[in-house]
């Protein structure tokens, strides 16, 4: 299990979607712990919460699901020279 923080990019799969509609707990197996929005946090968000570009999703789930969640947020995980994951915009 890992905890990740990914910003929601404009026009990504998460931009404008509800948590319920995304079913992140099924694929890629992540539970959204909180959403950082406008300087504040929405803790333990419910399924009706709609995500928007600029939100930051804080979620826990399997290490192998990170790349898929990043892609759904509009990012690609790329390993840098030190072996750390770095977010690069898709497209």
Model-derived features: where do they sit?
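Interdomain regulatory linker/hinge segments that flank or connect interaction modules
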Residues: 1-3
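Cytosolic Rossmann-like ligand/nucleotide-binding regulatory domains
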Residues: 5-73, 80-81
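Short peripheral tails and domain-boundary helices/loops at the edges of structured domains
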Residues: 77-91
């Amino acid at each position: 299990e890992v905890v990740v923080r990914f910003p929601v990019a404009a026009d990504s799969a998460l931009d404008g979607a509800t948590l319920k509609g995304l079913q992140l707990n099924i694929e890629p197996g992540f539970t959204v712990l909180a959403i950082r929005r406008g300087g504040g946090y929405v803790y333990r968000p419910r399924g009706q919460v709609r995500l928007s570009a600029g939100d930051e999703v804080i979620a826990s789930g399997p290490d192998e699901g990170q790349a898929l969640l990043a892609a759904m947020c509009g990012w690609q995980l790329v390993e840098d020279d030190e072996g750390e994951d770095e977010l690069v915009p898709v497209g």
